[in-house]
Swiss-Prot record:
Its cofactor is Mg(2+). Belongs to the protein kinase superfamily. CAMK Ser/Thr protein kinase family. This is Myosin light chain kinase 3. InterPro entries: Kinase-like_dom_sf, Prot_kinase_dom, Protein_kinase_ATP_BS, Ser/Thr_kinase_AS. Residues 67-114 are annotated as: Disordered. It comes from the Eukaryota. Keywords: ATP-binding, Cytoplasm, Kinase, Nucleotide-binding, Serine/threonine-protein kinase, Transferase. One of its GO terms (cellular component) is cytoplasm. Its EC number is 2.7.11.18. GO terms for biological process: cardiac myofibril assembly; heart morphogenesis; sarcomere organization; sarcomerogenesis; signal transduction; ventricular cardiac myofibril assembly. GO terms for molecular function: ATP binding; myosin light chain kinase activity. It is an enzyme of class 2 (transferase). It catalyses: L-seryl-[myosin light chain] + ATP = O-phospho-L-seryl-[myosin light chain] + ADP + H(+); L-threonyl-[myosin light chain] + ATP = O-phospho-L-threonyl-[myosin light chain] + ADP + H(+). It comes from Danio rerio (Zebrafish).
C-alpha cells in the first residue's frame, strides 16, 4: 500500500509521520475513484476580496509543477547548512515510523496575498485574535498540526506563557507585517523532498497548505480522498494555536521565498494584480479605530485573554467555502454604518476636546490680563437705527405720529428743550428737539438746520429722522443718544480720562469735522456741550446742534458774530471771514480740555477771554500736562495758531502721529484696547470654528469613502 499511495508530508514536530495514520485509517477501506477532494478555505486573518481570488487563480493556472527525483543529488540539501533547508528523508515501514525519516516531496510555499490563508480542514474555522481588522495588514501565519497529545500540551503551555507578551507586541508586529510572505503551494509528487525549517521554534510552528487545484492536477483522486479524510479527522481534534506565535521569522521567510520558482509570465500577471490591490487606500492610514467584525466562534484578543479557553467551533459541512465567504462579506457590509458612526466620533469628539482645552489655556491669560489692565474703548460707534432720509417739516400734529414724554428731558439750551419720544407705528425710541420760533428769521434758521442735516450721513454726526411745524414751534425728531455730554465727563473728577481716551475722542471729532468739510459745511459751534456720548461707559461720540452751521461757498465771504466765547476762533472775535480752519481752532481747544480739564483762554470775564484769544495767550499748564506726551502737545500747538492758513486741516489731523499707532501707545501705557481684545476673541473663535469645520469635513469624506467601499465590495 506504501507504493500505491503518495507519501504524506512530514509534520516536523517530534518526527511524526502522517503515513502511519493513513495506513491505520485506510487499511480496510476501498478506494473510491469518483470522489473529489473536499478542500476548503479557512478565513484565517481577514475577509478575502475578489481581487485576491483573481491573484490566486492566476498563480495556480500559470504555475508549473517542479519534479525532483528521489535519487537526484540536486534535490538534497546539506544538513550542515543552517539556512532553514530540510534534510533528506528516508522511507520507513509501518513499524518504524517514529525512528526513520521518510523521503518527502519538496514543497515551496508562496501566499498570494497577506490576507488569504488556506488550510487542510475545509470545515474548521480556527479561532483568531483580531488585533487590527484592517486589510493588507495582518501577517501570514502557518498553523501547526501537532503530532500527538504531548506535543499539543507543550504547544498550548507555550502559548499561555507568551500570551501576555504577545498582547503588548501585537500592534508593533501588525505595523511591521506589510512585508508579507508571498509563497504558493506546489503540487505534491512522489519522491520530492520536504522543506524543513531548522529553527527549533519554527519546527513546532510550521503548517502546510494544500491548494485544491494543484492537488487535482498532480494526485489521483482515489488516493487523495483517503488522505484528505484522514487529515480532516485529524484537524477536528487540533487545538487552536496562537497566530502570532506561529509566524515565521524573517530569515525563514526569505529562505522560503528563495525556493519559489514561477514563470516570468505568471510573475507579471501576479505583479499587475498586486498593483491593483495596492491602489486601494489602506484603512490603517486613516488613523481611525474600527469596530471589530464578529463572527460565530471567533473571539477577540481581549476575550481570549480573559477566558484563556481555546476551542474549535463545529462547522457545518453542508456549507461550502463560498457560502462562508459570502456570509462574512454580508456581515462586513452590515457593519459599515457602525464603522462610519465611529469615524464621526473619533474625528470630532477627541479633536473637539483638545480644541476646547487649547482655547481654555489661551483664554485664561487673556482673562487675567483683562482683569488687571485698564481697557480703553476705541471701537467705532454704531450707525443710526434707521436709514438716512431727506426730511421736510410737516404741518400736522406731532401727537398723531409720536408719543412725546414731556417729563423726561434729555437736554436744553437757548433754543429750547430735548425730550425722549417713541414712534407710534414702530416703537422706535427717538429724541424730539422742540424749538420755539417767534418770527420768520428764527423759523428760517431752524429750516436751515434741517437742510444741513439732510446732507449729513456719518456715524459721528447725529441723524435727522422727521420734522414737524406748528404756529409756535418747530420739532426735530432725531436719533436718540443716551450717554450725555462730553463736557460732563471732562468736569467729572471721578471719571478717569486718560490720554488714550482723549485720542479716541479727538479722532472721532476730527472724522466728523472732516466729513462736514467735505460737504462744504461749517459747524461754527464746536464745543464739548455739543458732543454727545453714545452711552455712559463707551468712548463713542456724535456731534450735534447744527443750528449755527453754514454752507460754505468759497466765493462768498462769510462772517459770523456768534458762538461760545472760550471756543471762538480769532477770526470770529475780529469779525473776519470764516472758513474750515475756524472749526479746527475749536478742535484744538476741545483737545486741550480733554487732556488737562482746563480751558486755555479762560479769563475772569468774557472780555478777558476774547482778549486772550486775539493775542493767542495760552500755555501748557505745568502740572496738568506733566504726563502728557510731546505728540499731544504738538497736535494742540498745530491747531491753536492765530494764522488760519497755518492750522492743521481735518485731513492733516487724521494723519498726525498722535492720532495714529494707537496699539503701540496702548503697549507703552500698559493698557488694553477694546477693539484689539474683540479682534483677538474673533480670531480665536474663527480658528476654533475653522478647526471644527475641517474636522467635520474630514469625517464626511471618510464616511463617503466607507460608503463607496461598501458599495464596491462584491456580495
Amino acid at each position: 500500500m506504501g507504493t500505491s499511495l503518495y507519501r504524506s508530508t512530514l509534520l516536523s514536530t517530534g518526527g511524526f509521520s502522517v503515513s502511519d495514520y493513513i495506513r491505520k485509517f485506510t487499511k480496510n477501506k476501498p478506494d473510491v475513484n469518483n470522489i473529489q477532494p473536499n478542500v476548503g478555505f479557512c478565513h484565517q486573518s481577514t475577509q478575502t476580496s475578489q481581487q485576491v481570488k483573481e491573484v490566486i487563480s492566476a498563480e495556480l493556472e500559470l504555475q508549473q509543477p517542479e519534479v525532483t527525483l528521489p535519487n537526484d543529488p540536486s534535490s538534497q540539501h546539506s544538513p550542515e547548512a543552517h539556512t532553514g533547508a530540510s534534510e533528506p528523508l528516508k522511507p520507513v515501514s509501518a513499524g518504524e515510523s517514529s525512528k526513520a525519516l521518510q523521503k518527502a516531496k519538496e514543497i515551496s510555499v508562496k501566499s498570494s496575498e497577506p490576507t488569504h490563508v488556506q488550510t487542510f480542514a475545509p470545515a474548521v474555522h480556527l479561532e483568531q485574535i483580531d488585533v487590527h481588522n484592517v486589510p493588507k495588514q495582518e501577517t501570514n501565519s502557518l498553523v501547526a498540526a501537532p503530532a500527538d497529545a504531548k506535543c499539543v500540551i507543550e504547544t498550548m503551555t507555550k502559548v499561555e506563557k507568551d500570551i501576555a507578551l504577545q498582547q503588548e507586541r501585537a500592534l508593533e508586529r501588525a505595523d511591521d507585517s506589510h512585508v508579507a510572505n508571498k509563497v504558493f503551494l506546489k503540487s505534491i509528487i512522489p519522491g520530492q523532498q520536504l522543506e524543513k525549517i531548522e529553527d527549533p521554534q519554527q519546527q513546532a510552528e510550521v503548517s502546510l497548505f494544500v491548494d485544491e487545484d494543484s492537488l487535482e492536477k498532480s494526485v489521483p483522486g482515489q488516493h487523495l480522498d483517503k488522505k484528505m479524510e484522514v487529515l480532516q479527522k485529524q484537524a477536528k481534534d487540533l487545538p487552536v494555536v496562537d497566530e502570532d506565535s506561529l509566524n515565521l521569522s524573517a530569515p525563514g521567510q526569505r529562505q522560503l521565498e528563495e525556493k519559489v520558482d514561477v514563470p516570468e509570465k505568471a510573475e507579471k500577471k501576479i505583479d499587475e494584480a498586486h498593483k491593483k490591490m495596492e491602489e486601494v487606500p489602506r484603512k490603517d492610514e486613516l488613523c481611525i479605530e474600527k469596530p471589530v467584525i464578529r463572527h460565530a466562534g471567533i473571539k477577540t484578543q481581549h476575550e481570549e485573554t480573559m477566558g484563556m479557553e481555546t476551542t474549535v467551533p463545529k462547522h457545518d459541512e453542508s456549507k461550502c467555502p463560498t457560502e462562508t465567504y459570502v456570509e462574512k462579506t454580508e456581515n462586513k457590509n452590515a457593519d459599515v454604518t457602525l464603522e462610519s458612526d465611529k469615524i464621526m466620533i473619533c474625528a470630532v469628539s477627541p479633536q473637539n476636546t483638545s480644541l476646547d482645552e487649547d482655547e481654555k489655556s489661551k483664554a485664561a491669560p487673556l482673562r487675567k490680563v483683562e482683569s488687571t489692565l485698564l481697557i480703553i474703548d476705541d471701537s467705532p460707534p454704531l450707525p443710526a437705527p434707521f436709514d438716512h432720509r431727506i426730511v421736510s417739516a410737516k404741518q400736522v400734529p406731532i401727537n398723531s405720529y409720536y408719543a412725546v414724554n414731556p417729563v423726561e428731558v434729555l437736554g436744553g439750551g437757548r433754543f429750547g428743550q430735548v425730550h425722549k419720544c417713541a414712534e407710534l407705528s414702530s416703537g422706535l425710541t427717538l429724541a424730539a428737539k422742540i424749538i420755539k420760533v417767534r418770527g420768520m428769521k428764527e423759523r428760517d434758521e431752524v429750516k436751515n438746520e434741517i437742510g444741513v442735516m439732510n446732507q449729513l450721513n456719518h456715524v459721528n454726526l447725529i441723524q435727522l429722522y422727521d420734522a414737524f411745524e406748528s404756529r409756535t414751534n418747530l420739532t426735530l425728531i432725531m436719533e436718540y443718544v443716551e450717554g450725555g455730554e462730553l463736557f460732563e465727563r471732562i468736569i467729572d473728577e471721578s471719571y478717569q480720562l486718560t490720554e488714550l481716551d482723549a485720542i479716541v475722542f479727538t479722532r472721532q471729532i476730527c472724522e466728523g469735522v472732516q466729513y462736514l468739510h467735505q460737504q462744504y459745511i461749517l459747524h461754527l459751534d464746536l464745543k464739548p456741550e455739543n458732543i454727545l456720548c453714545v452711552n455712559s461707559t463707551g468712548n463713542q461720540i456724535k456731534i450735534i446742534d447744527f443750528g449755527l452751521a453754514r454752507k460754505y461757498r468759497p466765493r462768498e465771504k462769510l462772517k459770523v458774530n456768534f458762538g461760545t466765547p472760550e471756543f471762538l476762533a480769532p477770526e470770529v472775535v475780529n469779525y473776519d471771514f470764516v472758513s474750515f480752519p475756524t472749526d479746527m481752532w475749536s478742535v484744538g481747544v476741545i483737545t486741550y480740555m480733554l487732556l488737562s480739564g482746563l480751558s486755555p483762554f479762560m479769563g475772569d470775564n468774557d472780555a478777558e477771554t476774547m482778549n486772550n484769544i486775539l493775542h493767542a495767550k495760552w500755555e501748557f499748564d505745568t502740572e496738568a500736562f506733566e504726563n502728557v506726551s510731546e505728540e499731544a502737545k504738538d497736535f494742540i500747538s498745530s491747531l491753536l495758531v492765530s494764522a488760519k492758513c497755518s492750522r492743521l486741516s481735518a485731513s492733516g489731523c487724521m494723519k498726525h502721529s498722535w492720532l495714529n499707532n494707537l496699539e503701540d501707545k496702548a503697549k507703552m501705557y500698559k493698557v488694553r484696547l477694546k477693539s484689539q481684545m474683540m479682534l483677538q476673541r474673533y480670531l480665536v473663535a474663527h480658528r476654533q470654528w475653522k478647526k471644527h469645520f475641517y474636522a467635520v469635513a474630514a469625517a464626511n469624506r471618510l464616511k463617503r469613502f466607507q460608503q463607496s467601499r461598501s458599495i464596491s465590495t462584491p456580495n
